[in-house]
């Protein structure tokens, strides 16, 4: 999988920009707030239709404009592919694959796979459970685009059920028949999410443990555990569904009192344990970076294994923050097999071999141009 070109129109701080990628590694260098991360965000949007930096499309469209656009040309084993994402400040999107409109997100997702590693990913360790759930969901969307539909379905049921519980708080009367219907829908959609998250971590956890040992010199033992809100006993859908309903019964009074749903995968946790200690309580920022790097390498390898092609790797202002050992581990892993886009404010911390084989682009005020150091092939 190779991203050949990217065209940005009225996206973030870009007016009109076309970037042709000429090497397996591209380094985007520039001061802060010039547009480096915006370019990686555009790739992320094409990959998952989600942004880890914004939940509102009006923030993605250049100020003063109504519409923005991202177009990518990709080379896959199956042949070339054009992807177009049209953004509107009112939140309505249109999607195209090879210039043909697609109505369902499902038909757009899965064409471009990318793994992003940014300084914000330290929140995987020290942040809330929601950060770790969001990470799981993004991986699943790439491995199984249908998961995006299941997640949307679940969140819709969750919002409706919460609105129903809040109406009980206001009005003081409860329609038990309607509540039972919402319980069944929440349990049904929630079961489908829970099973997929469980299966993902069964495959991802050993890879993360392997990479963590390799990077830390086998001095630390990482364990990654799925802690679902509804405890799992096996993978049988009916058993999980019944366990879901039972827990809803147990929490019924508390939910009615609080006016919100207390049961379901929206309250799952992913436990990260180093040497039998929760990682958020463990060690330095460097050790936390090691953990996140191990998770990202595991994600990279699993996506490659499942889709049969190496995904893109997006490194947003993190490579220069890694010490030489971690840099070398990352270099050794990706080599030239994974196309890599890297942002940085300076080139001083980079390995000479990286610079020698990389395309170097400068970014200033939403404009990208070739550096004097650029490989001009």
Swiss-Prot record:
Signal peptide segment: none
Chief subcellular location: cytoplasm
Subcellular compartments: Cytoplasm
Positions bound to ATP: 30-37
Record PANTHER family: DNA REPLICATION AND REPAIR PROTEIN RECF
UniProt family annotation: Belongs to the RecF family.
Protein name (Swiss-Prot/TrEMBL): DNA replication and repair protein RecF
Gene of this entry: recF
